[in-house]
Regions:
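Hydrophobic, aromatic-rich transmembrane alpha-helices
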Residues: 125, 297-327, 331, 335, ...
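Perimembrane helix-loop-helix junctions
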Residues: 12, 21, 213-246, 317-324, ...
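Aromatic- and kink-enriched transmembrane "portal" helix at the membrane-lumen/periplasm boundary
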Residues: 95, 109, 123, 145-168, ...
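Hydrophobic/aromatic-rich transmembrane helices and adjacent perimembrane loops
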Residues: 212, 338-340, 344-379
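Loop-to-helix entry region of an early transmembrane alpha helix in multi-pass inner-membrane enzymes
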Residues: 92, 96, 105-125, 157, ...
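Transmembrane-helix motifs of polytopic, lipid-linked glycan transferases
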Residues: 114-134, 142, 149, 173
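Membrane-interface alpha helices of multi-pass inner-membrane proteins
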Residues: 189-210, 214-219, 243, 247, ...
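Specific aromatic-rich, kink-prone transmembrane helix
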Residues: 166-185, 192, 200, 221-223, ...
């Protein structure tokens, strides 16, 4: 009983710490957070009205993946169990999100469009915070519509409503937490470790090939903690992250366990994806050629997104006064993220969209270069420029 009580107290303390940490994530004043959040919401709604086929602007959404997610979500609402009664190879979270959308708007994709807006606004707001830390508020303000333009008008965005699109804010937030830990000598809060592990789990249970960026950021964070605080720091960080991951997994263990579908879930999502879905042709040389081919297609078809991402990551490796950790802070997560995206041998145009999480790196670098010119603009000019970009 004592052990049980101690465990409950630990979990309660962890949730309280996570809540406190979540309130201070943006490091923005309440007024600025509200204003920038509203701007991000308006920009996201405007751009997705034209760029997502889930929008009311389109009479029909003919993209197969979106229809699969939505149909599976409605099936779950009707009592069918994913992987046991319905078959598809994505993770359970994406179907659960679409079940919520179907609960709100069962007849069309309006609920999905609203979901996309919320996730896009969160991504844009996080990008604002990242650029502000690197280049100041002026550049950060302009980065909101520019980021939306680069992401949602690119070829890799396709018709919208992809796992890659929904994963963007979670990928970026974990990356930002890792970069913030470089600036502080204090141990990472338990709440942040729980939150990062939870976000990693959310992406894992949507599409595990998108976890490369987060996985590398979390590993680097553990290694940095080990360097600063020894083995105790490493295992403290690792334990917090694993507990957060467990919290993201627990709902699915309960759901599939109660429905007698644990084996169906794990076989379909993990085994089938790892050994049946990905291409097994050729050897390492063939796979390397396919990865290079896929990377080139991303660069050539989506230059407005791909070129800034690559330029920003490369630029992040240079600069006076940077430590070795800071020089690899963006690079290694990008490389592992790209490996996860391209290594399968089969690459669809929307796969590299997950790498758009690195766009704030470019706008932060560019904003720092143009800082003096941006400082010369009047305050009234920024809303006008932002509106014009929209």
């Amino acid at each position: 009983m004592l052990a049980h009580g101690a465990g409950l107290c630990y979990i309660e303390e962890a949730f309280h710490a996570f809540y406190k940490e979540a309130l201070g994530l943006t490091k923005l004043s309440a007024r600025e957070r509200a204003r920038m959040g509203l701007l991000a919401l308006v920009v996201a709604a405007a751009v997705l009205f034209f760029c997502s086929k889930s929008s009311p602007a389109y009479p029909i959404n003919d993209w197969s993946d979106a229809n699969i997610y939505f149909s599976a979500g409605k099936g779950m609402l009707a009592g069918r169990v994913m992987y046991r009664d319905l078959y598809d190879h994505k993770g359970p979270l994406i179907y659960a999100l679409h079940a919520l959308c179907a609960l709100v708007c069962p007849a069309d994709f309006t609920g999905v469009w609203v979901l996309e807006i919320l996730f896009a606004a969160a991504f844009l707001l996080e990008g604002y915070r990242a650029v502000k830390a690197m280049a100041g508020r002026r550049a950060a303000l302009l980065s909101i519509p520019l980021t939306a333009l680069c992401v949602h008008t690119s070829y890799c965005f396709q018709a919208g409503d992809s796992a890659e699109e929904l994963a963007l804010p979670m990928i970026l937030l974990v990356q930002l937490h890792w970069l913030e830990s470089l600036k502080s000598e204090k141990p990472v809060f338990l709440g942040r470790l729980l939150g990062d592990g939870f976000l990693f789990g959310c992406v894992f249970w949507m599409k595990f090939t998108l976890c490369g960026t987060q996985g590398m950021a979390l590993l680097l964070g553990c290694l940095l903690d080990a360097r600063r605080n020894g083995a105790k720091g490493f295992f403290r960080s690792l334990g917090g992250l694993l507990l957060g991951f467990l919290l993201s997994t627990l709902p699915w263990l309960i759901y599939f366990g109660l429905n007698g579908a644990l084996a169906d879930w794990l076989k379909t999502y993990l085994y089938d994806n790892l050994f049946l879905y990905s291409s097994g042709e050729g050897g390492l040389l063939w796979r390397a050629k396919q990865m290079l081919k896929s990377g080139w297609e991303w660069l050539s078809r989506s230059p407005l997104c791909a070129l800034p991402v690559c330029a920003g990551v490369i630029a992040s490796c240079f600069g006076r006064g940077k430590t070795g950790w800071q020089r690899i802070g963006w690079l290694l997560p990008f490389l592992l993220g790209a490996l996860g995206v391209f290594i399968g041998g089969k690459t669809y145009p929307y796969y590299p969209l997950a790498l758009a999480a690195f766009l704030p790196c470019f706008f932060g670098w560019l904003g720092a270069l143009l800082e003096k010119r941006l400082a010369g603009l009047s305050k009234r000019a920024y809303p006008c420029i932002a509106a014009a970009l929209c």
